[in-house]
Structures are given as C-alpha cells and as structure tokens.
Amino acid sequence: MASNGHVNGGENFELCKKSADPLNWEMAAESLRGSHLDEVKKMVSEFRKPMVKLGGESLTVAQVAAIAVRDKSANGVKVELSEEARAGVKASSDWVMDSMNKGTDSYGVTTGFGATSHRRTKNGGALQKELIRFLNAGVFGNGTETSHTLPHSATRAAMLVRINTLLQGYSGIRFEILEAITKLINSNITPCLPLRGTITASGDLVPLSYIAGLLTGRPNSKAVGPNGETLNAEEAFRVAGVNGGFFELQPKEGLALVNGTAVGSGMASMVLFDSNILAVMSEVLSAIFAEVMNGKPEFTDHLTHKLKHHPGQIEAAAIMEHILDGSSYVKAAQKLHEMDPLQKPKQDRYALRTSPQWLGPQIEVIRAATKMIEREINSVNDNPLIDVSRNKALHGGNFQGTPIGVSMDNARLALASIGKLMFAQFSELVNDYYNNGLPSNLTASRNPSLDYGFKGAEIAMASYCSELQFLANPVTNHVQSAEQHNQDVNSLGLISARKTAEAVDILKLMSSTYLVALCQAIDLRHLEENLKNAVKNTVSQVAKRTLTMGANGELHPARFCEKELLRIVDREYLFAYADDPCSCNYPLMQKLRQVLVDHAMNNGESEKNVNSSIFQKIGAFEDELKAVLPKEVESARAALESGNPAIPNRITECRSYPLYRFVRKELGTELLTGEKVRSPGEECDKVFTAMCNGQIIDPMLECLKSWNGAPLPIC
C-alpha cells in the first residue's frame, strides 16, 4: 500500500474505514488547544529549523515562511521529500497513462479546458504543452524583480506548497518533477512569476504556469539565481543540478502543476507567520504603554475577563497582567494615585483600559486564519483528482481558494484593528493633555521651543493608520465572472493575500514607530524622576535655609511650610516647568508662592511681627531658589546624560526590559532631542529592519519567558 492509501490495482482500505471525526470539526477544534503564545513559540521554533521534510500532510505555516525568506546559503533551509510518498505518486501517474491508453475520457487529459472542455484530443502531451503556453498570460515589464513580478519569497513558498499537494498522490504527476522543483528550491533558483493575473479558481493558473514553463524549458521563462542573477531555463537547470533535460509533460501533468491554490496559500502562510508575531507584539506594547502612562493595572484583573468568556481576550489580559505584575512603574504609579487621586481620571481611557477586549478578538481571528491556511497547504486542491483505489477520476472543485480569500480578508481586518489601537495609544502618548506628565510630542531637549519630538512621527502614524484602514476593505466581494462564465465565482485568494501582505508591512511600520516612542517615554520617565529628585532636594534645602530661623536665631513659623512645599513638587508635572523651573509664568513657582501666602494668611497676629512674618520670608525663599534651582536641575540632567544618574532607570526592574534593552543597546538607538542631529525616522528604520528580519522576536518573547500560561489567581 502506498502512503496515500492507494493499493496499486486494489481497494483503498484506509479511506473505507469509518472515521470518529468524519466532518473534521474535532480536528479543527483540537488544533486550537493551548495558548496562542505557546503556538507562536512553536512557530518560531519550526521557522528556525534547518530542514523541512515534506510528506503531504504535516506542512506548517512557519515552515512555508522559513523556505520563503531563509534562502541565503549561510542560513538556508533545505527541503527533503519523503520517500514513502513515491509509490503513491507513481500509482496516480501510472493510472493516468493507463487510462489514456485505454481511451478513457478524462477532463484535461483528453478534453479541452474550462468552458471549452467539450473539445476532444488523443494527443495528451501536446494538450499539456498548449495549456502552459496559453496560461503564460502574465505581464512583467522590465527586469526580474519589478513591481509586476511576484516577490521571489512568495514564489518559493508557492513551490513548496505545490510539492506538498502533489506528494499526496492524487494528481497524476511523476515524482521526478517534484524532485526537480525541490532542487530548484534547495539551489535558490526561483522562477519569475507575474504579480497579477490570478483569481485563485481554478487555482492560481497563470502564475503557476510560469513554474511549469521553466520546467518545460519555455523560451520566455526566467529565473533568479542565488546571487540575484537572471537565468534562462537552461541555466537554471544547470545551476540546480537538474539532469536529463527539460520535461516533456505527460497527460495531466501540466494540469497538476497549475490547477492549485499554492501561490495564494503560500503567500498567506508568510503573511500569517508575521501576523501572529505582530499580535503578540501588540500585547507587549500595550503593557509597556500602561507602564509609561502611569496606568492602573486593574484593567487586567482576571475576573473581568473570565466573565466575558472570550479566550483571546482572557489571554491578552493575562499576558499584560504578567508584564505589569511587579513592575516598578506600577508600584510608583500606585503611590502617585494614592497621594493625589484627582490628578488623573478615575479610569484610564479606552485605548489602555479596553486593550485586552480590543486585541482578543483580533488574536482569535488571526489564529483561526492560521489554522485554515494550514489545512489548505496540506490539502489536495487540483482537478480532476485521481482515485486509483476506485479506478476513477473525480471531477470537483478543490481548486476554489475560498479559504484563502476569506481568511486573508479576516486577517487583514484584524491587522487594521490592531493598528487602530496602536495609533490611539500613540496619540495619547505624545499628547501632554492625556499622557500624565510626559512632555508634548515626547520632547527631551532643554528648550522645548526648539524641539518638536515625535510630531512628524505622529503625522506618519496617521498616514500609516489611514492606509491600513483602507486595506481592511474586503477583496472577496469584488468577484468577476471569468473564463466564459465557467469560473463564475472565484476566490481572489492571492489578491487578498497580497493586500494582507501590504497590511503586515504597514503594521510593522506602525509597531516600530510606536516602540521607538515608548522607549523615548521610558527615558523621559527616567529623566523626570531624576530632575524631580533634584528639584525636591533643592526646595527642601532652600526652605530649611530661608524659612527655618528668624532674624534673631529663633525658630520661625514658616518652617512648617516645607512639607507642603514638597507636596507641590511631588504633584506638579516636572515637564510643565523643567526648561525654566523658576519662571513666574510656569506653575511651580506660582504654587510654591501660594503655599507661603496661604500659610501667611493663617499666621494670625504673628504676621504683624516682622520677625515672625511669613510674608517677609517669601522674597528670600524665591531669590535663593532662583539662584540655585536652575543649576541643580542642569546638574542632574548632565549626570544622567553622562551615565551617572542619581536614580537608575526603573525599566531595568521590569519584565518589559528585554525589549527596551534590545532597542537601545543592540540596535544602538538613543533618546531623541532637538539638540542632536539624529532624526526619529533613523531610529524607527533600525527597529523596522529588526522586525522585518526577525531580530525582534527573541527579546519580545523574553519579556514573557516566565509566564506560566495562566492569569494570576483571583484571591
């Protein structure tokens, strides 16, 4: 018996057995067992393995993504075909030839194609050759990697998926052709496919015909070599070590190569690998946002989310809860809220407080789409299907790529929703009306009039978000009847996958810009803490020197003002006055004076005595403060800039630290100020590049390495 259940000339006992899960619902449900984070960790592990062994039924999204992008020889992934599949593949190929020789009438073997399948021929080989010729209808423009050429990574993904389908032995193709495609992949030889021209039903006919064109040596076929060089078919075969010359297609083999969903599902696999990473990133960034915004962590309390029942929401909240649990920022914010409960609203705004409720459904959608595509890349999706065991060809429609179109539309909408949340959080972060004491635009210079910080980045974020929201519109409701109304409904799977790839790219732009802004906010909180410490110490010392003693050495009633003066320093936002702390136009000096005035008004009869008058002390207090405070503030800032701050950065005590450390230390980004030359875009570029090449994954997962997969107990 062959691995696909075929018995040459006999019955298929495997498929005749009664299944405990005949409709596959239990299998689909079982695939969602466990946490999304564990699934992402597994995907990352699979992505990094050096070998993908194809057998037809166990290919994963991560493996497709690995073959697609890890194509450099130093870090390449190799493909190996299961020898167990050879017999089944040969059985279906032999069946087609026997059927042809017996005169059996089969679609695409003895008939024409689609709406013209009423035509008949006995010249099966020539029919396959014509199939590839007329499907070579794509337009490239000039070059091999133009705006009209499918990205080579997507082509590699398509080649892998198509091999996996054909290995299952229901397609009537020789094993040697699958070996040749495998050699092309392993040698980094990538056929050039047109970007457009497929409706993914009947499969991705037009782009897949260019892979077949290379295999058959068509003169218009091109490929790209390991170093980006352009190759014709002969050169591609030589570099890949494919011996024996070009393939003369036997009956059904051309149809087997082109009549499937591999291009759409291959690109969808790449898109979903990135989408899952970005979904986890959005959870981590939301937690960091809560930290730098002095957020109230109760929004992650498990009872709230348990009562809502949705698993994506429960997991998102639990992940944020884990990062915030024990956070130094949360502890400091709690003291702040207790000291002055009216300083900020009782509840945080929706972008923070409802982030688990917002992200949860998006994670569920992305996870469901991933499972749908994994089923698709392990499916047999051409037509007709060769059932050797029952000695028949089945004429159906597995080439209809609806799972791709639907899952990609859904995933793209989820990505747009994640981007919308990021933009809402970013907008709060840079706005000093909402960000709980951070400077407007996250400016960090001594002179805010010459530093506009992330203003340009916010405009860019609005642009990204607008384009992302546009891309959220569905593709699948734009179906046109095609091929003389034979293909009157079609999935548009690859088009939707391409649009989702664009959405992923834009969400990476948003995520990288947002992460740079969060790191800026972390450093501003560090600066704030050090400068406020300097202000507090200076006010305390000046108060002791000027308010404690009277002119004759007696204790002065003004000494009782110190505690309230320090409370003013604690409550006043540092960046509201930091550029000129003694300015009478800024709130610090105004409120310090008001404390002394209020005490003087309550000083009663003592105020009439010059020696005990608090009013008489105000001038001396303010004069000395003006002489000392600006120098102390500058000294504290200089100490921080030289790496010797009085108070260390709180982020080092937080579970979110690995991501901050990566951005600052490994990528070499820095606090952005108007005093320096470096622009926000330069720093965002570094993070974006790290996201695109996968460097960001490990520090992101390190933030969650101690999470046990469950919320904190309710007690």
Swiss-Prot record:
Keywords annotated in UniProt: Cytoplasm, Lyase, Phenylalanine catabolism, Phenylpropanoid metabolism
Position of the 5-imidazolinone (Ala-Gly) cross-link: 201-203
Protein name: Phenylalanine ammonia-lyase
EC number, UniProt record: 4.3.1.24
Induction: Rapidly induced after wounding.
Tissues showing expression: Expressed in flowers, roots, leaves and stems.
Family (UniProt): Belongs to the PAL/histidase family.
Native organism: Nicotiana tabacum
Gene Ontology BP terms: cinnamic acid biosynthetic process; L-phenylalanine catabolic process
Entry keyword annotation includes Cytoplasm: yes
